[in-house]
Amino acid sequence: VTTSLAEPRTTASGTRRTRGRVGPGRAVGIGLIWLFVAASLLLLLWMLLTSLRDSRSIFDDPWALPDPFRLSNYTTAFDSGFGRAAVNSALVSGSAALVSVVLAAPAAYALSRRLNRMAGPLTMLFVLGLGVPGQVLLIPVFFMLTEVGMVDSLPGLFLVYVGIAMPFTVFLLTGFFRSLPGELEEAAALDGASPGRTFWQIVLPLARSGLITAFILQLINNWNETLFALALMQSNDNFTLPLVLARFIGEQQYKGADWGGMFAGLCLVVAPMLVLYGWLSRRIISGMTLGIGK
């Protein structure tokens, strides 16, 4: 009896030691990940410090610290249209991300519950939509917006962002809704709740993490989008941040390269989404992983 009782203990401790062990392949992988993280952080820090220097000192020693700090570089960037472009990007990106989630949530819920036999084929259509490159849609979208007079307008760009966001948003939320237990909906139905009331008052609050994840991912994607904005926006007043940055870099080639101003512009484009993603990274990761395997 003593021997038989001791055996499981030995096995359990051996299992713990095996789980705690890190193989050479995994150690190399972890090391490479940390190396990539360190390189990314150093590049971001270098970009921030360089944005506070003048062009001459940057050429003399690219890796030196700012001395003195030139906050005027950010004034130069704002005078080149970054302030107006930041407002345009925030309005279009935020509203498009919000509307895409609002439209995708009911569709994803219906597909996740397979309310009719068309749910499977419709889900496949949304999945296929993920593989359509934006370059293929560019010319048809341009002609359609030209017909309705919405080229070079922020509402037109808003509609484009909502449209191209739907396949991924529906796909992401479908997997998330499938991870939610169906027993809650059955209990609500027994209590007399309609399908609409069940969706709005029970399912949506439970899916809050998934909805926030979808919103943040679409917001970041819209904020950084350049292709459709470059093709559709023609007047400076409607430019978004990536377009103003590209124009600012082009202007410096003729005025004399203001490298400090260019790096300040890069910081203005990168910083908002970087801070937002860093703040909500845990919620985003948990929201994306909850629906895996369902």
Predicted regions and their residues:
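A hydrophobic, multi-pass inner-membrane permease signature
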Residues: 2-294
